[in-house]
Amino acid sequence: MKVVIIGGGTAGTATAAKLRRLDENVEIVILEKNNEFAVSNCSFPYYISGVIKDSRQLIGATAESMKEIYNTDIRLNCEVEMIDRQEKTLRITGKPDESYDKLVLATGAEQLRPDIDGVLSEKVMTVRSLRSIRNLKDFIIGNEVRKVLVLGGGYIGVEMAESFVKLGLEVSLIDAATHVLPNFDADMAAPIHNILRGRGIRLYLQRQIAAFDEAQAVLSDGTRLDYDLCLIATGVRPDLRLPVLAELEIGERGGLKVNRHLQTSDKDIYAAGDNLEIENLITGRPVMFSNASLAVKQAKIIAENLSGIGSEFSPVVGTSITPVFDYTAAAAGCSEKMLQDNGIDYFKLNIYQNTHAGYLPESGQMLFKLLFAPDGKILGVQGLGQNGIAGRIDTIAAIIKSGGSVAQLEEAEICYAPAYASAQDAVNNLGSLAQEVLSGKIRFAFYDDIGKDDVFLVDVRMPEVFQSGHIDGAINIPLAAIRNNLDSIPHDKRGILYCNRGVGAYKAACILDNRGFDNVFVLSGGSNLFSEIMEDKSQQ
């Protein structure tokens, strides 16, 4: 059997490697249109910032090593023009046709380049290939660049903006959305915005670039920004030129449609990586999800199917993670917008918790948001903090993958020692609070509830803390004084209790609930999150 793989990125090389480990006799050919392959696009920001010194470190393998270790024929500078499905041949630019028994499309995605006046200027660049990232760095060094625009607030946009700041450049980030990082909700994006602004990045949200001239970019609201360089980071779309020419079926989201075995509408043609649609575990709907980890999993499934092992690619949770200077932002599952778009009912809550025992000097703060269904099924989680975020999000993602509920979060056995976690870890607390929400024991209010006419706002912190600053309209009843001030809290209004992080307010709410108050709420995320959101709004 002869297997030809079009594309030498993560999906293509991983397919070849796994297939060779399973079958020593199969003939494997990789056709790559560029002169380099196995390039780690995800590491481009680290090359720009100088963490990675040599661009050759971005290359994960060479044609020689793939030949020696995996007996794979790597052909660079081979661009496939057309797939002849009837004859099972590939037309290659300037080279003889190539036959195949089985074909794997690992063509990835292509950079979206918006149609903007002046976008073809040499000062307006994209980064999708090794050549392009080298050109970008050379341009910065050779042209005394000081002012940089980043168009696009997704993961690559935010990471590249950070890298430019680390080079000492002035950075403005422009995005048409209301907030950066689309897998996050607005409340969780607010502190991320504040971190970015705190490091000097100017945010221009709900705006686009309308035109470029030689010295300035004109935004959709008329704002003019000086620039020496603009990076286009507006996302990618599947590279479907070959599948469309071959009349393979395209899915409803615009990606290549595949079955659970990752076969296209032609059973002899498989696909892996950024060019295909996959099923979202929570919504049951097709999604486009660019992720190297998923590409490797898909490569394994294809290799096993080509070797006669009947493997299936299961629906995905959808995980993501990115550094934001000294912080880590990570998410798994659905955001509120995704749930709303798919008509899925949900509850939500936010909590702050220490990374580990608070009495240790290295302890930091983490912020989490949990989304869950009325039946307790976990729908999504988002986290932000300086330490400890990845492990918690991964744990919850694994529970989501297994179809788990909030009860399993509370029951999860998390490694404990004071230097690593609290005795009641954030994962457990999220599950515990979610179960109390479902039972009606606790009710949460949110930042947009503040200021409504039917709300009575109570700050349960100590008087000296209250005097140093509080939410407008709040009265102060310290937690220890709640029982002696029951008459001060009306029954005919929604009582919203808050403290810094929500712990004291939760304790006060339990007291009031046990005293017959059935209209008491805890401000989700406390005044800390409320302040982050208000600060963000004040800067917009």
Predicted regions, residues:
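Mid-to-C-terminal Rossmann-like scaffold of FAD/NAD(P)H-dependent oxidoreductases
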Residues: 1, 7-8, 275-387, 422, ...
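Beta1-alpha1 glycine-rich phosphate/pyrophosphate-binding loop at the start
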Residues: 1-72, 112, 161-184, 319, ...
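N-terminal Rossmann-like dinucleotide/flavin-binding domain of flavoprotein oxidoreductases
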Residues: 18-102, 185-202, 337-338, 429-432, ...
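A Rossmann-like FAD-binding core segment of flavoenzymes
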Residues: 25-27, 69, 74-92, 97-98, ...
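Rossmann-like dinucleotide-binding cores of NAD(P)H-dependent redox enzymes
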Residues: 59, 147, 155-210, 289-294, ...
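Glycine-rich dinucleotide-binding loop and its adjacent helix/turn
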Residues: 107-167, 202, 258-260, 475-481, ...
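FAD-site-proximal beta/loop scaffold in flavoenzymes
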Residues: 120-144, 215-218, 224-301, 395, ...
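Rhodanese-like catalytic fold shared by cysteine-dependent sulfurtransferases
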Residues: 407-418, 422-445, 450-456, 462-496, ...
